[in-house]
């Protein structure tokens, strides 16, 4: 298997893992991501005094591999689903407890903490520094205090089991997660795939001329998918069909690309000639469908390669159209502000 074929297979496995396994449809059914909800933490979560060096020392004494930090935001439907469906699964919870002490942090918490180097800073600054820009985000730290792996977005039980296999099994020491997925996929029998993506008239057809070295009149959305991806079909059926999403999407130059396509030429925003596979490989996408947003000058301003239902997709489109990134506002902060506006309006 070549490196590029391996990457395509890795994306294929990511799509496969995005679907509920047999018998688990009810447990991993779609949820309303506009709901403002709260989940109770499992009883085995660690009560931390927010000195991560002390927490790591206690994990070492207990014979564990390190720390798992869960970053969430208040009212986050994706966080609740992950906690209720994955972390409260008895077998998954037992494996996490065996290998990691788990600490739950709030992305916007003003409380002070000490990081793994003993530096004092607010939790919210630590979250931003460590790349916890979406909720939920998981950060795994080893006993040496180094980051082992970062996981962004809702993880179904099936996907999270693979994450745990990768980290707890020590594969992060020798393989990137992408290469690990490719290795797992190489052992699976090939399945028949539909010949084409689900097409939508809001997306431009080839030739894909996305060069923005001379500023364009609209922002750009590149949607990476692949044939046979159940999550991609669901995204078209349940999200892209929404009138509000379609109204906002019409204000973008929008293209959909097959992340396995190693032949179709694409003139990228920076003027380079690529194929969809090469571009997806460079971006290191971990989940399909993936939405990558660029401003009028070709600068990437937002990437969402985690599970995204209607509300998060609407917020992503609005974030780019409002140019909130120009004010230094991260996506999760923007989402929180919009949620507070909804609460004040009684919606």
Kindly give the residue locations of the regions a language model identified.
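Bacterial N-terminal signal peptides
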Residues: 9-18
């Amino acid at each position: 298997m070549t490196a590029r074929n391996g990457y395509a297979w890795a994306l294929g496995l990511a799509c496969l893992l995005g679907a509920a396994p047999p018998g688990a449809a009810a447990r991993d059914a779609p949820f309303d991501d506009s709901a403002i909800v709260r989940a109770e933490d499992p009883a085995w979560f660690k009560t931390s005094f927010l000195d991560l060096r002390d927490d790591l020392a206690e994990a070492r004494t207990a014979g564990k591999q390190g720390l798992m930090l869960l970053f969430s935001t208040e009212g986050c439907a994706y966080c609740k689903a992950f906690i209720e469906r994955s972390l409260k699964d008895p077998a998954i919870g037992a494996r996490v407890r065996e290998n990691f002490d788990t600490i739950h942090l709030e992305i916007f918490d003003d409380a002070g903490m000490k990081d793994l180097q003993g530096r004092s800073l607010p939790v919210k600054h630590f979250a931003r520094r460590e790349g916890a820009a979406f909720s939920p985000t998981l950060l795994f730290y080893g006993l040496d205090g180094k980051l082992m792996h970062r996981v962004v977005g809702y993880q179904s039980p099936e996907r999270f089991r693979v994450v745990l296999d990768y980290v707890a099994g020590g594969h992060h020491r020798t393989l990137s997660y992408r290469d690990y997925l490719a290795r797992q996929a190489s052992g699976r029998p090939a399945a028949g795939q539909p010949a084409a993506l689900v097409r939508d008239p809001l997306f431009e057809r080839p030739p894909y001329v996305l060069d923005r070295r001379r500023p364009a009149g609209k922002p750009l959305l590149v949607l990476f998918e692949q044939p046979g991806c159940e999550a991609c079909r669901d995204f078209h059926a349940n999200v892209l069909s929404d009138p509000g999403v379609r109204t906002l999407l019409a204000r973008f130059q929008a293209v959909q690309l097959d992340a396995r396509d190693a032949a179709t030429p694409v003139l990228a925003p920076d003027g380079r000639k690529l194929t969809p596979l090469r571009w997806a490989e460079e971006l290191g996408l971990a989940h399909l469908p993936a939405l990558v947003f660029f401003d009028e000058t070709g600068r990437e301003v937002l990437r969402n390669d985690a599970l995204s239902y209607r509300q998060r997709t609407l917020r992503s489109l609005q974030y780019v159209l409002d140019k909130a990134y120009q004010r230094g506002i991260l996506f999760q902060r923007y989402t929180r502000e919009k949620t507070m506006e909804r609460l004040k309006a009684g919606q």
